């Protein structure tokens, strides 16, 4: 009799994806983030479900319903803190996962990469609508400022904004629909994750060397299940440290005040994981130009496979491109810092220089470095 795990129609799929999957023998800890993102998604869906059982999406009661969850619901404070800080862990893992893809040339699996970029955009949309739900000051004004950006679209902009708002300002209709979006999007993300994995398993995983690993594969279980379990424990440790010891460290103090349309906070800024894009948006004095730059800062990921000029896939043996990659990383950290600063000198000019160098590095310098490294590899005698 054949083993059930190899014959049962459903268990067979799980077996081919997580147990008998042939994996390269040399993939490093940078390949852990896929499973960590899966774990983050599960944590967010579960904690979110329990929060939704007690939350009310009405402007009059939303803020107090969140307070009620934290005060009166059994372990409500823990569920809320895990959900809020789980989002930060999600984005931390996402950024590292994308960075890994760029460093090791994983973007050359174009279908997997493109679905990944769509996933990134969907997760960003989910986080944005979720941030509005507690109906604090920063929730309200963040929603107002970001949705207002759509009014920069010529001709249909204003109509589009009012259509999204469900009125002439961010109000009850907006909050209700944002709650609906925030509930449905994680399930769309889950479906996209399955498509992402489907395309990945068509080609098999990349590895640090960037060389075809077919000649040396090992089974996913037990080697990578145990490795992923270690990564998961480390991530859960960091998440619990955040949620239990400093749950409000990454939040904004303004969100402890209920939303007030008559009082604007001195500095409107999004959560830390959007600050790099927010800095790029603010660095252009023109509204439409800023919105286009904001979109380009994320959508540029889609053209990265087209900008690959090197004969080698990975950056492992390419010191010049490595240097540029880490400059790009430092540049993104700088943008994140600038996004949280007030709009005044010297922050304005630093933000503008960092924004220009962000696009310059990706579109021009890294492809040129690839060509130069090809030239350096050619025999000169």
Curated annotation (Swiss-Prot):
PROSITE patterns: CYTB_CTER, CYTB_NTER
SUPFAM superfamilies, sorted: a domain/subunit of cytochrome bc1 complex (Ubiquinol-cytochrome c reductase), Transmembrane di-heme cytochromes
Lineage: superkingdom: Eukaryota
Entry binding sites for a ubiquinone: 201
Residues that hold heme b b566 according to the record: 97, 196
Transmembrane segments annotated in the record for this chain: 33-53, 77-98, 113-133, 178-198, 226-246, 288-308, 320-340, 347-367
Keywords of this entry: Electron transport, Heme, Iron, Membrane, Metal-binding, Mitochondrion, Mitochondrion inner membrane, Respiratory chain, Transmembrane, Transmembrane helix, Transport, Ubiquinone
Name of one Pfam family that matches: Cytochrome_B
Cellular component GO terms held in the UniProt record: mitochondrial inner membrane; respiratory chain complex III
Biological processes per GO annotation: mitochondrial electron transport, ubiquinol to cytochrome c
Note on how the cofactor is bound: Binds 2 heme b groups non-covalently.
Cofactor: heme b
Membrane topology of this protein: Multi-pass membrane protein
MF annotations from Gene Ontology: metal ion binding; ubiquinol-cytochrome-c reductase activity
Binding site for heme b b562: 83, 182
Compartment annotation: Mitochondrion inner membrane
CDD domains per the UniProt record, alphabetical: cytochrome_b_C, Cytochrome_b_N
Miscellaneous section: Heme 1 (or BL or b562) is low-potential and absorbs at about 562 nm, and heme 2 (or BH or b566) is high-potential and absorbs at about 566 nm.
Function: Component of the ubiquinol-cytochrome c reductase complex (complex III or cytochrome b-c1 complex) that is part of the mitochondrial respiratory chain. The b-c1 complex mediates electron transfer from ubiquinol to cytochrome c. Contributes to the generation of a proton gradient across the mitochondrial membrane that is then used for ATP synthesis.
UniProt similarity note: Belongs to the cytochrome b family.
PANTHER family recorded: CYTOCHROME B
Assembly with partners or alone: The cytochrome bc1 complex contains 11 subunits: 3 respiratory subunits (MT-CYB, CYC1 and UQCRFS1), 2 core proteins (UQCRC1 and UQCRC2) and 6 low-molecular weight proteins (UQCRH/QCR6, UQCRB/QCR7, UQCRQ/QCR8, UQCR10/QCR9, UQCR11/QCR10 and a cleavage product of UQCRFS1). This cytochrome bc1 complex then forms a dimer.
Name of the protein in question: Cytochrome b
Gene: MT-CYB
């Amino acid at each position: 009799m054949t083993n059930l795990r190899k014959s049962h129609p459903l268990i067979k799929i799980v077996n081919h994806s997580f147990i008998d999957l042939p994996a390269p023998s040399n993939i490093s800890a940078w390949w852990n983030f896929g499973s960590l993102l899966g774990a983050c998604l599960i944590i967010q869906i579960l904690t979110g479900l329990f929060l939704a059982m007690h939350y009310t999406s009405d402007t009059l009661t939303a803020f107090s319903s969140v307070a009620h969850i934290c005060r009166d619901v059994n372990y409500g404070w823990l569920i809320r803190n895990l959900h809020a800080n789980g989002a930060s862990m999600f984005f931390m893992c996402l950024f590292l996962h994308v960075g890994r893809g760029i460093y090791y040339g994983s973007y050359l699996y174009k279908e997997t990469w493109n679905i990944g970029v769509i996933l990134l955009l969907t997760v960003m949309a989910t986080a944005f609508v979720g941030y509005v739900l507690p109906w604090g000051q920063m929730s309200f004004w963040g929603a107002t400022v970001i949705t207002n950006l759509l009014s920069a679209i010529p001709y249909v902009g204003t109509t589009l904004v009012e259509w999204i708002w469900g009125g002439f300002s961010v109000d009850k209709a907006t909050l209700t629909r944002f709650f609906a979006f925030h509930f449905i999007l994680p399930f769309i993300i889950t479906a996209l994750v399955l498509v992402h994995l489907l395309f990945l398993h068509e080609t098999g995983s990349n590895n640090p060397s960037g060389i075809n690993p077919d000649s040396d594969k090992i089974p996913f279980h037990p080697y990578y299940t145990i490795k992923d379990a270690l990564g998961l424990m480390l991530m859960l440790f960091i998440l619990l440290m955040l949620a239990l010891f400093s749950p409000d460290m990454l939040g904004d103090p303004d969100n402890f005040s209920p939303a007030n349309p008559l009082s604007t906070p001195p500095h409107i800024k999004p959560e830390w994981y959007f600050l790099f894009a927010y800095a790029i948006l603010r660095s252009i004095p023109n509204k439409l130009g800023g919105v286009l730059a904001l979109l380009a800062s994320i959508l540029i990921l889609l053209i990265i496979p087209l900008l690959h000029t090197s004969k080698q896939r990975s950056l492992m043996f390419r010191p010049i491109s490595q240097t540029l990659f880490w400059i790009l990383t430092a540049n993104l950290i700088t943008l994140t810092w600038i996004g949280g600063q007030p709009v005044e000198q010297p922050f304005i000019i630093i933000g503008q220089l960092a924004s220009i160098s962000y696009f310059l590095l990706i579109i021009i310098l890294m492809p040129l470095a690839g060509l130069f490294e090809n030239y350096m590899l050619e025999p000169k005698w």
